[in-house]
Structure formats: structure tokens, C-alpha cells
């Protein structure tokens, strides 16, 4: 029977485990260009921020004369006022944001008539002042025509003399002048104690008409 060599007695030290299984090599070839691009972008952003901050601080140290702070002035009486800056025209343009100056040295031109051709054709002509020859009789007085009412209509009992026993809901109107044609509304006048004018639209009835109405209705009193 052949003899086999026995292992030596005692602990045998071998190589460590990390040396037995070495790390695989990483492919770092594409990483280098990517990191260079990121570093370039970061440097560009940092440079832009520094330039903008430098310009901002320089402008803050040298303020614009057109946008200076308002001047405070003490007026008599212990009042603190803000002194206006610039001229009145500049202030108006800055306030309203208008490109056209709002304060002009000449009178504004009359607005031109704007509209369609049909509207201008159907529009009534503008009234022209009549060229009357001067007369030596003195200034002529213009007769004032009373205001016309839309809902006015001639009543059958208007125009006759007031009879006894009339019950009127309004005071009798004044007689129209001779120049006013018959059938035109009478001039309105102020009601005593009231700011509203009296238009003369209230109906006027007589006692006989009221009695005839109730007789026709077959009643002598109103019941609820």
C-alpha cells in the first residue's frame, strides 16, 4: 500500500481573500469627457454670476440721476413735504405712461368725425347759424317754448272755465300764452314744498263724474 504524505500539523497561513479575488478593472474611458463638459458648464455659470453681480453693485454705487430719491422739504408750520421731481409735463407722462405729452402749449384740435360712410350719409346735417342782417330795432327776445311731455294728451275738460264743485287733484295750470298753439303741453312749474316739478298729468274729475261712476258700478261705498 503506497504511503501518502500527511499534511504538516499546525495552522497554515494562505493569501488574503481580497488578493485571491481582485477587483475588476472599470472602463473609465467615456467618464473623462463627460466630467470635462460638466466642469466647463459650472465654470461658465460661475463666471456669468460674477459679472452680473459686479455690474449690479457698480450701478448701486453710482445711482442714475433720472431715478434719484425724492427730496424732503420742511414747510412752514412743521409740515414735511416731498419736493416734486421734473417738470409738470414729465410727471404727467410718467404717471399716465403716455407716449404723447398730455400737457400741450396749444389748444386741442377738434376731433374728426369717425364712422362708416352709411352712418355719415344718414346723419342729419349740422345746424348752421343763420346769417341775419343786423336790425336797428334792438335785441330781439326769444320766446321760450315750454317743455314737451311725452305722455301729455289734451283732456276734454281742459279749456273750459272752472265750474263750482270741481274736485281737482292738482292746482289749476296757468293759461298758455297766445304764441303757444292749442294742444301743446303746458309749462311745468315747481310744486310748493317739493323739489319735483308738477307735470300736469294728474286727472281732474268732478263730483258729478264720481257719483255717476259709483252709480254705474252699483255701489255707494267702498268695502273691503
Curated annotation (Swiss-Prot):
Membrane topology value: Single-pass membrane protein
Transmembrane intervals: 32-52
Pfam family, one: DUF4689
Sites carrying sugar chains: 4
Modification type Phosphothreonine: residues: 112, 116
PTM summary: O-glycosylated with core 1 or possibly core 8 glycans.
Keyword annotations from UniProtKB, A to Z: Glycoprotein, Membrane, Phosphoprotein, Transmembrane, Transmembrane helix
Subcellular compartments: Membrane
Phosphoprotein recorded as keyword: yes
Positions of the UniProt region annotated as Disordered: 104-138, 152-203
Gene Ontology CC annotations of this record: membrane
Entry-annotated residues carrying Phosphoserine: 194
The keyword Lyase belongs to this UniProt entry's keyword annotation: no
PANTHER family, alphabetized: TRANSMEMBRANE PROTEIN C16ORF54
Name of the featured protein: Transmembrane protein C16orf54
Amino acid at each position: 500500500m503506497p504511503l501518502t504524505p500527511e499534511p504538516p500539523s499546525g495552522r497554515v497561513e494562505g493569501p488574503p481573500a481580497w488578493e485571491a479575488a481582485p477587483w475588476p478593472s472599470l472602463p473609465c474611458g467615456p467618464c473623462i469627457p463627460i466630467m470635462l463638459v460638466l466642469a466647463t458648464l459650472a465654470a461658465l455659470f460661475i463666471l456669468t454670476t460674477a459679472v452680473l453681480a459686479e455690474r449690479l453693485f457698480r450701478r448701486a454705487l453710482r445711482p442714475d440721476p433720472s431715478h434719484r430719491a425724492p427730496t424732503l422739504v420742511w414747510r412752514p408750520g412743521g409740515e414735511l413735504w416731498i419736493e416734486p421731481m421734473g417738470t409738470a409735463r414729465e410727471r404727467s407722462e410718467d404717471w399716465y405712461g403716455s407716449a404723447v405729452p398730455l400737457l400741450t402749449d396749444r389748444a386741442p384740435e377738434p376731433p374728426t368725425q369717425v364712422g362708416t360712410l352709411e352712418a355719415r350719409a344718414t346723419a342729419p346735417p349740422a345746424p348752421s347759424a343763420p346769417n341775419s342782417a343786423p336790425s336797428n330795432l334792438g335785441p330781439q327776445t326769444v320766446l321760450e317754448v315750454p317743455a314737451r311731455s311725452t305722455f301729455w294728451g289734451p283732456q276734454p275738460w281742459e279749456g273750459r272755465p272752472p265750474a263750482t264743485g270741481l274736485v281737482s287733484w292738482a292746482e289749476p295750470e296757468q293759461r298758455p300764452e297766445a304764441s303757444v298753439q292749442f294742444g301743446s303741453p303746458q309749462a311745468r312749474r315747481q310744486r310748493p314744498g317739493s323739489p319735483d316739478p308738477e307735470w300736469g298729468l294728474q286727472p281732474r274729475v268732478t263730483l258729478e263724474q264720481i257719483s255717476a261712476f259709483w252709480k254705474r258700478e252699483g255701489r255707494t261705498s267702498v268695502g273691503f
